Amino acid sequence: MDADQEKDLQKFLKNVDEITNLIQEMNSDDPVVQQNAVLETEKRLLLMEEDQEEDECRTTLNKTVISPPQTAVKSAEEVNSEAFLASVEKDAKERAKRRRENKVLADALKDKGNEAFAEGNYETAILHYSEGLEKLKDVKVLYTNRAQAYMKLKNYEKALVDCEWALKCDEKCTKAYFHMGRANLALKNYSVSRECYKKILEINPKLQTQVKDYLNQVDLQEKADLQEKEAHELLDSGKNTAVNTKNLLETLSKPDQIPLFYAGGIEILTEMIKECTEQTLFRMHDGFSIISDNEVVRRCFSTAGKDAIEETVCVSVLKLWQAVCCGNEENQRVLVMHPDRARLLATLLSSKVLAIRQQSLALLLQLAQTESGRSLIISHLDLTRLLEALVSFLDFSDKEANTAMGLFTDLALEERFQVWFQANLPGVLPAVTSVLKTDPKVSSSSALCQCIAIMGNLSAEPATRGHMAACEEFGDGCLSLLARCEENVALFREVIYTLLGLMMNLCLQAPFVSEVWAVEVSRRCLSLLNSQDGGILTRAAGVLSRTLSSSLKIVEEALQAGVVKKKKKKKKKKKKK
Protein backbone atom coordinates (compact mmCIF):
# COMPACT_ATOMS: atom_id res chain seq x y z
CA MET A 1 0.00 0.00 0.00
CA ASP A 2 1.56 3.30 -1.11
CA ALA A 3 1.59 6.50 0.97
CA ASP A 4 -1.52 8.04 -0.65
CA GLN A 5 -3.59 4.91 -0.06
CA GLU A 6 -2.39 4.77 3.55
CA LYS A 7 -3.40 8.43 3.98
CA ASP A 8 -6.87 7.78 2.49
CA LEU A 9 -7.37 4.76 4.73
CA GLN A 10 -6.48 6.72 7.87
CA LYS A 11 -8.82 9.52 6.80
CA PHE A 12 -11.61 7.00 6.23
CA LEU A 13 -11.08 5.35 9.64
CA LYS A 14 -11.07 8.76 11.32
CA ASN A 15 -14.37 9.61 9.61
CA VAL A 16 -15.83 6.29 10.77
CA ASP A 17 -14.82 7.02 14.39
CA GLU A 18 -16.23 10.55 14.28
CA ILE A 19 -19.49 9.47 12.65
CA THR A 20 -19.88 6.60 15.14
CA ASN A 21 -19.49 9.08 17.99
CA LEU A 22 -22.06 11.40 16.40
CA ILE A 23 -24.58 8.57 16.09
CA GLN A 24 -24.05 7.65 19.76
CA GLU A 25 -24.52 11.29 20.78
CA MET A 26 -27.70 11.59 18.70
CA ASN A 27 -29.10 8.65 20.69
CA SER A 28 -28.12 10.26 24.01
CA ASP A 29 -30.74 10.89 26.72
CA ASP A 30 -29.31 14.37 27.25
CA PRO A 31 -31.22 16.74 24.92
CA VAL A 32 -28.34 19.19 24.83
CA VAL A 33 -25.82 16.52 23.71
CA GLN A 34 -28.38 15.24 21.21
CA GLN A 35 -28.96 18.71 19.77
CA ASN A 36 -25.22 19.42 19.45
CA ALA A 37 -24.75 16.11 17.62
CA VAL A 38 -27.49 16.99 15.13
CA LEU A 39 -25.91 20.38 14.47
CA GLU A 40 -22.45 18.83 14.01
CA THR A 41 -23.86 16.24 11.59
CA GLU A 42 -25.54 18.93 9.54
CA LYS A 43 -22.28 20.87 9.45
CA ARG A 44 -20.34 17.81 8.23
CA LEU A 45 -22.92 17.11 5.54
CA LEU A 46 -22.70 20.70 4.33
CA LEU A 47 -18.91 20.46 4.07
CA MET A 48 -19.21 17.14 2.22
CA GLU A 49 -21.61 18.70 -0.31
CA GLU A 50 -19.18 21.58 -0.90
CA ASP A 51 -16.32 19.10 -1.46
CA GLN A 52 -18.44 17.18 -3.97
CA GLU A 53 -19.24 20.37 -5.87
CA GLU A 54 -15.55 21.24 -6.03
CA ASP A 55 -14.75 17.76 -7.37
CA GLU A 56 -17.42 18.09 -10.08
CA CYS A 57 -16.14 21.50 -11.20
CA ARG A 58 -12.44 20.63 -11.04
CA THR A 59 -10.71 19.83 -14.40
CA THR A 60 -7.42 17.96 -14.30
CA LEU A 61 -4.89 18.63 -17.10
CA ASN A 62 -1.64 16.69 -17.20
CA LYS A 63 0.52 16.95 -20.29
CA THR A 64 3.56 15.04 -19.07
CA VAL A 65 4.39 11.82 -20.87
CA ILE A 66 5.52 10.07 -17.74
CA SER A 67 2.24 10.69 -15.86
CA PRO A 68 0.40 7.36 -15.48
CA PRO A 69 -3.21 7.16 -16.75
CA GLN A 70 -5.87 7.94 -14.10
CA THR A 71 -8.19 5.11 -13.26
CA ALA A 72 -11.95 5.70 -13.21
CA VAL A 73 -12.44 2.86 -10.75
CA LYS A 74 -12.77 3.95 -7.10
CA SER A 75 -11.06 2.04 -4.36
CA ALA A 76 -13.12 -0.13 -2.01
CA GLU A 77 -12.35 2.24 0.85
CA GLU A 78 -13.76 5.23 -1.07
CA VAL A 79 -16.91 3.31 -2.01
CA ASN A 80 -17.48 2.22 1.60
CA SER A 81 -16.82 5.75 2.89
CA GLU A 82 -19.26 7.38 0.48
CA ALA A 83 -21.92 4.77 1.16
CA PHE A 84 -21.53 5.26 4.90
CA LEU A 85 -21.76 9.05 4.62
CA ALA A 86 -24.78 8.75 2.34
CA SER A 87 -26.42 6.59 4.98
CA VAL A 88 -25.66 9.18 7.65
CA GLU A 89 -27.02 11.96 5.42
CA LYS A 90 -30.24 10.03 4.88
CA ASP A 91 -30.51 9.36 8.61
CA ALA A 92 -29.95 13.04 9.43
CA LYS A 93 -32.65 14.12 6.98
CA GLU A 94 -35.07 11.62 8.47
CA ARG A 95 -34.24 12.85 11.97
CA ALA A 96 -34.74 16.48 10.89
CA LYS A 97 -38.12 15.57 9.42
CA ARG A 98 -39.14 13.71 12.59
CA ARG A 99 -37.94 16.68 14.67
CA ARG A 100 -40.16 19.07 12.72
CA GLU A 101 -43.13 16.75 13.17
CA ASN A 102 -42.38 16.32 16.88
CA LYS A 103 -42.03 20.10 17.29
CA VAL A 104 -45.59 20.55 16.05
CA LEU A 105 -46.84 17.86 18.46
CA ALA A 106 -44.81 19.28 21.37
CA ASP A 107 -46.20 22.78 20.79
CA ALA A 108 -49.76 21.42 20.70
CA LEU A 109 -49.19 19.58 23.99
CA LYS A 110 -47.67 22.71 25.50
CA ASP A 111 -50.83 24.67 24.60
CA LYS A 112 -53.00 21.95 26.18
CA GLY A 113 -50.85 22.13 29.30
CA ASN A 114 -51.21 25.91 29.43
CA GLU A 115 -55.00 25.61 29.19
CA ALA A 116 -55.08 23.09 32.03
CA PHE A 117 -52.78 25.30 34.12
CA ALA A 118 -55.03 28.33 33.59
CA GLU A 119 -57.99 26.26 34.82
CA GLY A 120 -56.07 25.19 37.93
CA ASN A 121 -55.68 21.56 36.80
CA TYR A 122 -51.98 21.38 37.61
CA GLU A 123 -51.69 17.57 37.52
CA THR A 124 -53.21 17.53 34.02
CA ALA A 125 -50.91 20.35 32.96
CA ILE A 126 -47.88 18.36 34.15
CA LEU A 127 -49.10 15.34 32.17
CA HIS A 128 -49.37 17.37 28.94
CA TYR A 129 -45.96 19.02 29.44
CA SER A 130 -44.40 15.60 30.09
CA GLU A 131 -45.96 14.19 26.91
CA GLY A 132 -44.54 17.14 25.02
CA LEU A 133 -41.07 16.41 26.38
CA GLU A 134 -41.38 12.81 25.21
CA LYS A 135 -41.82 14.20 21.70
CA LEU A 136 -38.96 16.67 21.99
CA LYS A 137 -36.54 16.71 24.90
CA ASP A 138 -34.84 20.07 24.35
CA VAL A 139 -37.80 22.50 24.59
CA LYS A 140 -36.95 24.77 27.54
CA VAL A 141 -40.45 26.25 27.84
CA LEU A 142 -41.89 22.79 28.54
CA TYR A 143 -39.45 22.39 31.44
CA THR A 144 -40.15 25.85 32.90
CA ASN A 145 -43.91 25.46 32.51
CA ARG A 146 -43.83 22.07 34.18
CA ALA A 147 -41.67 23.53 36.95
CA GLN A 148 -44.30 26.21 37.52
CA ALA A 149 -47.01 23.54 37.76
CA TYR A 150 -44.89 21.59 40.27
CA MET A 151 -44.54 24.81 42.27
CA LYS A 152 -48.32 25.11 42.48
CA LEU A 153 -48.43 21.59 43.94
CA LYS A 154 -45.60 22.51 46.36
CA ASN A 155 -43.34 19.88 44.78
CA TYR A 156 -40.32 22.16 44.90
CA GLU A 157 -37.64 19.50 44.38
CA LYS A 158 -39.12 18.40 41.04
CA ALA A 159 -39.49 22.04 40.05
CA LEU A 160 -35.76 22.55 40.65
CA VAL A 161 -34.88 19.52 38.51
CA ASP A 162 -36.95 20.88 35.61
CA CYS A 163 -35.28 24.28 35.95
CA GLU A 164 -31.85 22.63 35.69
CA TRP A 165 -32.95 20.86 32.49
CA ALA A 166 -34.21 24.17 31.09
CA LEU A 167 -30.79 25.72 31.78
CA LYS A 168 -29.12 22.84 29.92
CA CYS A 169 -31.24 23.80 26.92
CA ASP A 170 -30.49 27.51 27.38
CA GLU A 171 -28.00 28.67 29.98
CA LYS A 172 -29.48 32.19 29.85
CA CYS A 173 -33.08 31.15 30.57
CA THR A 174 -34.20 33.82 33.08
CA LYS A 175 -37.54 32.09 33.63
CA ALA A 176 -35.71 29.01 34.91
CA TYR A 177 -33.70 31.11 37.37
CA PHE A 178 -36.91 32.82 38.51
CA HIS A 179 -38.62 29.52 39.32
CA MET A 180 -35.42 28.23 40.96
CA GLY A 181 -35.39 31.32 43.14
CA ARG A 182 -39.00 30.77 44.19
CA ALA A 183 -38.50 27.06 44.83
CA ASN A 184 -35.42 27.66 46.97
CA LEU A 185 -37.27 30.39 48.85
CA ALA A 186 -40.07 27.94 49.63
CA LEU A 187 -37.45 25.44 50.83
CA LYS A 188 -35.89 28.20 52.98
CA ASN A 189 -32.62 28.07 51.03
CA TYR A 190 -32.35 31.84 51.25
CA SER A 191 -28.77 32.33 50.04
CA VAL A 192 -29.33 30.04 47.03
CA SER A 193 -32.56 31.87 46.23
CA ARG A 194 -30.72 35.20 46.23
CA GLU A 195 -28.05 33.84 43.88
CA CYS A 196 -30.73 32.67 41.43
CA TYR A 197 -32.35 36.10 41.36
CA LYS A 198 -29.00 37.87 40.99
CA LYS A 199 -28.25 35.61 38.02
CA ILE A 200 -31.34 37.04 36.29
CA LEU A 201 -29.88 40.53 36.67
CA GLU A 202 -26.56 39.40 35.17
CA ILE A 203 -28.37 38.03 32.13
CA ASN A 204 -30.80 40.93 31.71
CA PRO A 205 -29.98 44.19 33.57
CA LYS A 206 -33.30 45.67 32.39
CA LEU A 207 -35.09 43.46 34.94
CA GLN A 208 -33.55 45.37 37.85
CA THR A 209 -36.91 46.49 39.29
CA GLN A 210 -38.33 42.96 39.29
CA VAL A 211 -35.16 41.45 40.73
CA LYS A 212 -35.18 44.07 43.49
CA ASP A 213 -38.70 42.96 44.42
CA TYR A 214 -37.69 39.28 44.38
CA LEU A 215 -34.69 39.93 46.64
CA ASN A 216 -36.88 41.96 48.98
CA GLN A 217 -39.25 38.99 49.26
CA VAL A 218 -36.32 36.76 50.26
CA ASP A 219 -35.23 39.25 52.93
CA LEU A 220 -38.75 39.54 54.34
CA GLN A 221 -39.33 35.80 54.49
CA GLU A 222 -35.94 35.16 56.10
CA LYS A 223 -36.70 37.86 58.65
CA ALA A 224 -40.14 36.34 59.34
CA ASP A 225 -38.56 32.91 59.74
CA LEU A 226 -36.16 34.23 62.38
CA GLN A 227 -39.03 35.98 64.18
CA GLU A 228 -40.98 32.73 64.36
CA LYS A 229 -37.98 30.84 65.75
CA GLU A 230 -37.57 33.44 68.50
CA ALA A 231 -41.30 33.40 69.25
CA HIS A 232 -41.24 29.60 69.56
CA GLU A 233 -38.35 29.82 72.01
CA LEU A 234 -40.17 32.39 74.18
CA LEU A 235 -43.36 30.34 74.11
CA ASP A 236 -41.45 27.21 75.10
CA SER A 237 -39.75 29.11 77.92
CA GLY A 238 -43.18 29.98 79.34
CA LYS A 239 -42.99 33.77 79.00
CA ASN A 240 -46.29 35.21 80.24
CA THR A 241 -47.13 37.50 77.33
CA ALA A 242 -46.37 34.75 74.81
CA VAL A 243 -48.52 32.19 76.61
CA ASN A 244 -51.34 34.68 77.22
CA THR A 245 -51.40 35.69 73.55
CA LYS A 246 -51.76 32.06 72.50
CA ASN A 247 -54.44 31.34 75.11
CA LEU A 248 -56.48 34.43 74.25
CA LEU A 249 -56.48 33.52 70.55
CA GLU A 250 -57.80 30.08 71.48
CA THR A 251 -60.58 31.76 73.48
CA LEU A 252 -61.50 34.06 70.59
CA SER A 253 -61.71 31.08 68.25
CA LYS A 254 -64.91 29.93 70.02
CA PRO A 255 -67.81 30.30 67.57
CA ASP A 256 -71.29 31.82 67.99
CA GLN A 257 -70.60 34.09 70.97
CA ILE A 258 -72.28 37.48 71.42
CA PRO A 259 -70.56 40.43 69.63
CA LEU A 260 -69.46 42.04 72.90
CA PHE A 261 -67.58 38.83 73.80
CA TYR A 262 -65.40 39.24 70.71
CA ALA A 263 -65.12 43.03 71.04
CA GLY A 264 -63.87 42.72 74.62
CA GLY A 265 -61.46 39.89 73.85
CA ILE A 266 -60.04 41.72 70.84
CA GLU A 267 -59.49 44.89 72.87
CA ILE A 268 -57.61 42.91 75.54
CA LEU A 269 -55.53 41.20 72.86
CA THR A 270 -54.71 44.58 71.30
CA GLU A 271 -53.37 45.81 74.65
CA MET A 272 -51.15 42.72 74.87
CA ILE A 273 -49.52 43.27 71.46
CA LYS A 274 -46.53 45.32 72.51
CA GLU A 275 -43.53 43.73 70.78
CA CYS A 276 -42.57 41.74 67.71
CA THR A 277 -42.90 38.49 69.68
CA GLU A 278 -46.62 38.96 70.29
CA GLN A 279 -47.13 40.09 66.68
CA THR A 280 -45.40 36.95 65.44
CA LEU A 281 -47.35 34.65 67.77
CA PHE A 282 -50.56 36.23 66.50
CA ARG A 283 -49.56 35.29 62.95
CA MET A 284 -48.23 31.84 63.88
CA HIS A 285 -51.46 30.87 65.64
CA ASP A 286 -53.59 31.97 62.68
CA GLY A 287 -54.84 35.12 64.39
CA PHE A 288 -55.83 36.86 61.15
CA SER A 289 -58.13 34.01 60.11
CA ILE A 290 -59.54 33.52 63.61
CA ILE A 291 -60.73 37.13 63.61
CA SER A 292 -61.70 37.78 59.97
CA ASP A 293 -63.33 34.38 59.37
CA ASN A 294 -65.47 34.56 62.50
CA GLU A 295 -69.13 34.64 61.39
CA VAL A 296 -70.18 37.15 64.06
CA VAL A 297 -67.34 39.52 63.14
CA ARG A 298 -68.13 39.13 59.44
CA ARG A 299 -71.77 40.03 60.07
CA CYS A 300 -70.72 43.15 61.95
CA PHE A 301 -68.58 44.28 59.01
CA SER A 302 -71.19 43.49 56.35
CA THR A 303 -74.14 45.23 58.05
CA ALA A 304 -74.83 48.56 56.33
CA GLY A 305 -76.56 50.38 59.19
CA LYS A 306 -74.39 49.40 62.14
CA ASP A 307 -75.59 49.71 65.72
CA ALA A 308 -73.27 50.73 68.56
CA ILE A 309 -72.17 47.16 69.34
CA GLU A 310 -71.42 46.29 65.70
CA GLU A 311 -69.48 49.53 65.35
CA THR A 312 -67.46 48.64 68.47
CA VAL A 313 -66.57 45.22 67.03
CA CYS A 314 -65.44 46.72 63.70
CA VAL A 315 -63.36 49.45 65.31
CA SER A 316 -61.73 46.98 67.73
CA VAL A 317 -60.70 44.69 64.84
CA LEU A 318 -59.19 47.61 62.89
CA LYS A 319 -57.22 48.74 65.95
CA LEU A 320 -55.99 45.17 66.48
CA TRP A 321 -54.77 44.99 62.87
CA GLN A 322 -52.90 48.25 63.40
CA ALA A 323 -51.22 46.82 66.49
CA VAL A 324 -50.15 43.54 64.88
CA CYS A 325 -48.98 45.20 61.63
CA CYS A 326 -47.04 48.11 63.12
CA GLY A 327 -43.47 47.65 61.85
CA ASN A 328 -44.11 44.00 60.98
CA GLU A 329 -43.92 43.59 57.20
CA GLU A 330 -44.77 39.88 57.23
CA ASN A 331 -47.99 40.54 59.14
CA GLN A 332 -48.81 43.31 56.67
CA ARG A 333 -48.33 40.84 53.83
CA VAL A 334 -50.58 38.22 55.46
CA LEU A 335 -53.28 40.82 56.12
CA VAL A 336 -53.41 42.39 52.65
CA MET A 337 -52.74 39.36 50.44
CA HIS A 338 -55.91 37.62 51.62
CA PRO A 339 -58.53 38.55 48.95
CA ASP A 340 -61.43 38.96 51.40
CA ARG A 341 -59.46 41.22 53.73
CA ALA A 342 -58.12 43.27 50.79
CA ARG A 343 -61.69 43.88 49.58
CA LEU A 344 -62.80 44.71 53.11
CA LEU A 345 -60.10 47.37 53.60
CA ALA A 346 -61.11 49.26 50.45
CA THR A 347 -64.80 48.99 51.38
CA LEU A 348 -64.41 50.18 54.98
CA LEU A 349 -62.71 53.37 53.81
CA SER A 350 -66.10 54.39 52.36
CA SER A 351 -68.10 53.37 55.45
CA LYS A 352 -70.92 55.63 56.61
CA VAL A 353 -69.62 55.25 60.17
CA LEU A 354 -67.02 57.94 60.83
CA ALA A 355 -65.03 55.93 63.41
CA ILE A 356 -64.67 53.00 61.00
CA ARG A 357 -63.50 55.31 58.18
CA GLN A 358 -60.98 56.94 60.49
CA GLN A 359 -59.50 53.64 61.69
CA SER A 360 -59.42 52.21 58.15
CA LEU A 361 -57.53 55.29 56.97
CA ALA A 362 -55.12 55.03 59.90
CA LEU A 363 -54.41 51.37 59.06
CA LEU A 364 -53.78 52.05 55.35
CA LEU A 365 -51.57 55.04 56.17
CA GLN A 366 -49.56 52.79 58.49
CA LEU A 367 -49.10 50.24 55.68
CA ALA A 368 -48.02 52.95 53.25
CA GLN A 369 -45.05 53.98 55.41
CA THR A 370 -42.87 51.27 53.86
CA GLU A 371 -42.08 50.43 50.25
CA SER A 372 -43.32 46.87 50.70
CA GLY A 373 -46.55 48.15 52.28
CA ARG A 374 -47.22 50.52 49.38
CA SER A 375 -46.53 47.69 46.96
CA LEU A 376 -49.08 45.51 48.80
CA ILE A 377 -51.75 48.21 48.59
CA ILE A 378 -51.16 48.85 44.88
CA SER A 379 -51.03 45.15 44.02
CA HIS A 380 -53.97 43.83 46.05
CA LEU A 381 -56.51 46.56 46.79
CA ASP A 382 -59.21 47.88 44.46
CA LEU A 383 -57.43 51.13 43.60
CA THR A 384 -60.41 52.71 41.84
CA ARG A 385 -62.54 52.28 44.94
CA LEU A 386 -59.65 53.36 47.15
CA LEU A 387 -59.11 56.55 45.11
CA GLU A 388 -62.82 57.41 45.21
CA ALA A 389 -62.81 56.98 48.98
CA LEU A 390 -59.68 59.09 49.46
CA VAL A 391 -60.96 62.11 47.49
CA SER A 392 -64.24 61.94 49.42
CA PHE A 393 -62.23 62.83 52.56
CA LEU A 394 -61.90 66.39 51.17
CA ASP A 395 -65.34 67.02 52.69
CA PHE A 396 -64.10 66.00 56.17
CA SER A 397 -62.11 67.93 58.77
CA ASP A 398 -58.70 69.37 57.92
CA LYS A 399 -56.89 66.63 59.83
CA GLU A 400 -58.69 63.74 58.14
CA ALA A 401 -58.57 65.37 54.70
CA ASN A 402 -54.83 66.01 54.98
CA THR A 403 -54.23 62.45 56.20
CA ALA A 404 -56.14 61.04 53.22
CA MET A 405 -54.25 63.24 50.76
CA GLY A 406 -50.99 62.22 52.43
CA LEU A 407 -51.82 58.58 51.68
CA PHE A 408 -52.82 59.53 48.12
CA THR A 409 -49.46 61.29 47.67
CA ASP A 410 -47.48 58.32 49.00
CA LEU A 411 -49.18 56.00 46.51
CA ALA A 412 -49.04 58.44 43.57
CA LEU A 413 -45.24 58.69 43.84
CA GLU A 414 -44.94 54.96 43.14
CA GLU A 415 -44.21 54.02 39.52
CA ARG A 416 -46.65 51.10 39.70
CA PHE A 417 -49.46 53.43 40.73
CA GLN A 418 -48.66 55.79 37.87
CA VAL A 419 -48.77 52.89 35.39
CA TRP A 420 -52.10 51.76 36.86
CA PHE A 421 -53.50 55.31 36.80
CA GLN A 422 -52.64 55.77 33.13
CA ALA A 423 -54.10 52.39 32.15
CA ASN A 424 -57.32 52.93 34.11
CA LEU A 425 -57.78 56.68 33.65
CA PRO A 426 -61.15 56.50 31.82
CA GLY A 427 -62.65 54.76 34.86
CA VAL A 428 -60.84 56.93 37.41
CA LEU A 429 -61.36 60.32 35.72
CA PRO A 430 -64.86 60.92 37.20
CA ALA A 431 -63.43 60.67 40.74
CA VAL A 432 -60.55 62.98 39.86
CA THR A 433 -62.91 65.45 38.16
CA SER A 434 -65.11 65.54 41.27
CA VAL A 435 -62.21 67.16 43.13
CA LEU A 436 -62.47 70.19 40.83
CA LYS A 437 -66.11 70.63 41.86
CA THR A 438 -65.12 71.03 45.50
CA ASP A 439 -66.14 74.23 47.24
CA PRO A 440 -62.88 75.81 48.49
CA LYS A 441 -64.82 77.71 51.16
CA VAL A 442 -65.87 74.44 52.79
CA SER A 443 -62.98 72.06 52.07
CA SER A 444 -59.50 72.06 53.55
CA SER A 445 -57.39 74.34 51.34
CA SER A 446 -54.17 72.49 52.11
CA ALA A 447 -55.70 69.09 51.31
CA LEU A 448 -57.29 70.45 48.12
CA CYS A 449 -53.93 71.88 47.03
CA GLN A 450 -52.26 68.55 47.71
CA CYS A 451 -54.84 66.69 45.61
CA ILE A 452 -54.57 69.12 42.68
CA ALA A 453 -50.76 68.93 42.88
CA ILE A 454 -50.98 65.13 42.53
CA MET A 455 -53.13 65.57 39.41
CA GLY A 456 -50.59 68.06 38.08
CA ASN A 457 -47.74 65.60 38.59
CA LEU A 458 -49.69 62.78 36.95
CA SER A 459 -50.61 65.03 34.00
CA ALA A 460 -46.92 65.46 33.19
CA GLU A 461 -47.12 62.07 31.45
CA PRO A 462 -48.31 62.72 27.83
CA ALA A 463 -50.90 59.91 27.64
CA THR A 464 -52.46 60.90 30.98
CA ARG A 465 -52.44 64.57 29.99
CA GLY A 466 -54.11 63.68 26.68
CA HIS A 467 -57.00 61.94 28.47
CA MET A 468 -57.46 64.85 30.87
CA ALA A 469 -57.32 67.49 28.14
CA ALA A 470 -59.79 65.56 26.00
CA CYS A 471 -62.34 65.43 28.83
CA GLU A 472 -64.60 68.49 28.54
CA GLU A 473 -65.93 68.02 32.06
CA PHE A 474 -62.39 68.01 33.47
CA GLY A 475 -61.50 71.23 31.63
CA ASP A 476 -64.71 72.92 32.75
CA GLY A 477 -64.00 71.77 36.30
CA CYS A 478 -60.64 73.57 36.24
CA LEU A 479 -62.32 76.77 35.03
CA SER A 480 -65.15 76.67 37.55
CA LEU A 481 -62.78 76.05 40.47
CA LEU A 482 -60.55 78.91 39.29
CA ALA A 483 -63.59 81.20 39.10
CA ARG A 484 -64.65 80.31 42.67
CA CYS A 485 -61.15 80.91 43.99
CA GLU A 486 -60.87 84.30 42.24
CA GLU A 487 -63.63 85.57 44.53
CA ASN A 488 -60.98 85.77 47.25
CA VAL A 489 -57.50 85.52 45.73
CA ALA A 490 -55.75 86.22 49.03
CA LEU A 491 -57.60 83.43 50.87
CA PHE A 492 -57.26 80.84 48.11
CA ARG A 493 -53.82 81.86 46.88
CA GLU A 494 -52.30 78.35 47.23
CA VAL A 495 -55.23 76.69 45.46
CA ILE A 496 -55.03 79.14 42.53
CA TYR A 497 -51.26 78.71 42.26
CA THR A 498 -51.50 74.90 42.23
CA LEU A 499 -54.46 74.89 39.83
CA LEU A 500 -52.60 77.13 37.36
CA GLY A 501 -49.76 74.58 37.38
CA LEU A 502 -52.21 71.83 36.38
CA MET A 503 -53.71 74.05 33.66
CA MET A 504 -50.24 74.86 32.28
CA ASN A 505 -49.71 71.13 31.77
CA LEU A 506 -53.12 70.73 30.11
CA CYS A 507 -52.31 73.57 27.72
CA LEU A 508 -49.30 71.63 26.46
CA GLN A 509 -51.78 69.30 24.80
CA ALA A 510 -52.93 70.30 21.33
CA PRO A 511 -55.66 70.73 20.35
CA PHE A 512 -57.32 72.13 23.47
CA VAL A 513 -60.66 70.92 24.78
CA SER A 514 -62.18 73.66 22.62
CA GLU A 515 -61.40 77.16 21.39
CA VAL A 516 -64.13 78.47 23.69
CA TRP A 517 -62.37 76.83 26.65
CA ALA A 518 -59.00 78.32 25.65
CA VAL A 519 -60.56 81.79 25.32
CA GLU A 520 -62.17 81.55 28.76
CA VAL A 521 -58.91 80.32 30.31
CA SER A 522 -57.07 83.23 28.70
CA ARG A 523 -59.59 85.75 30.06
CA ARG A 524 -59.25 84.34 33.57
CA CYS A 525 -55.48 84.55 33.35
CA LEU A 526 -55.61 88.10 31.93
CA SER A 527 -57.49 89.19 35.04
CA LEU A 528 -54.88 87.48 37.24
CA LEU A 529 -52.11 89.56 35.69
CA ASN A 530 -53.22 92.35 38.02
CA SER A 531 -52.28 90.19 41.01
CA GLN A 532 -49.55 91.40 43.33
CA ASP A 533 -48.50 87.78 43.95
CA GLY A 534 -45.38 86.95 41.94
CA GLY A 535 -46.10 83.22 41.81
CA ILE A 536 -49.65 83.63 40.50
CA LEU A 537 -48.50 86.32 38.05
CA THR A 538 -45.79 84.04 36.64
CA ARG A 539 -48.07 81.03 36.22
CA ALA A 540 -50.91 83.07 34.72
CA ALA A 541 -48.47 84.45 32.16
CA GLY A 542 -47.25 80.90 31.50
CA VAL A 543 -50.78 79.69 30.75
CA LEU A 544 -51.40 82.72 28.51
CA SER A 545 -48.25 81.99 26.52
CA ARG A 546 -49.84 78.67 25.54
CA THR A 547 -53.44 79.78 24.95
CA LEU A 548 -53.22 83.19 23.26
CA SER A 549 -52.35 81.77 19.86
CA SER A 550 -55.53 79.68 19.80
CA SER A 551 -57.83 82.65 19.13
CA LEU A 552 -57.44 85.94 17.28
CA LYS A 553 -60.22 87.37 19.44
CA ILE A 554 -58.33 86.81 22.67
CA VAL A 555 -55.17 88.28 21.13
CA GLU A 556 -57.13 91.47 20.40
CA GLU A 557 -58.38 91.53 24.00
CA ALA A 558 -54.80 91.13 25.21
CA LEU A 559 -53.73 94.02 22.98
CA GLN A 560 -56.48 96.22 24.39
CA ALA A 561 -55.45 95.30 27.91
CA GLY A 562 -51.87 96.22 27.09
CA VAL A 563 -50.58 92.72 27.78
CA VAL A 564 -49.37 92.32 24.22
CA LYS A 565 -47.96 95.38 22.50
CA LYS A 566 -47.78 95.99 18.78
CA LYS A 567 -44.36 96.51 17.35
CA LYS A 568 -43.92 100.09 16.21
CA LYS A 569 -42.53 100.59 12.76
CA LYS A 570 -39.29 102.52 12.76
CA LYS A 571 -39.38 105.72 10.71
CA LYS A 572 -36.68 106.02 8.12
CA LYS A 573 -34.46 109.05 8.59
CA LYS A 574 -34.26 111.37 5.60
CA LYS A 575 -30.80 111.88 4.29
CA LYS A 576 -29.60 115.45 4.15
CA LYS A 577 -28.96 116.74 0.73
UniProtKB/Swiss-Prot annotation:
GO terms for cellular component: centrosome; cytoplasm. The keyword Phosphoprotein applies. The modification Phosphothreonine is found at residue 71. Its main location: cytoplasm. Pfam families: TPR_1, TPR_8. PROSITE patterns: TPR, TPR_REGION. Keywords: Cilium biogenesis/degradation, Cytoplasm, Phosphoprotein, Repeat, TPR repeat. Gene3D superfamilies: Leucine-rich Repeat Variant, Tetratricopeptide repeat domain. One of its GO terms (biological process) is axonemal dynein complex assembly. It is found in: Cytoplasm. TPR repeats lie at residues 106-139, 140-173, 174-207. InterPro entries: ARM-like, ARM-type_fold, TPR-like_helical_dom_sf, TPR_rpt, TTC12. Cytoplasmic protein that plays a role in the proper assembly of dynein arm complexes in motile cilia in both respiratory cells and sperm flagella. This is Tetratricopeptide repeat protein 12. The lineage of its organism: Eukaryota, Metazoa, Chordata, Craniata, Vertebrata. The gene is TTC12.
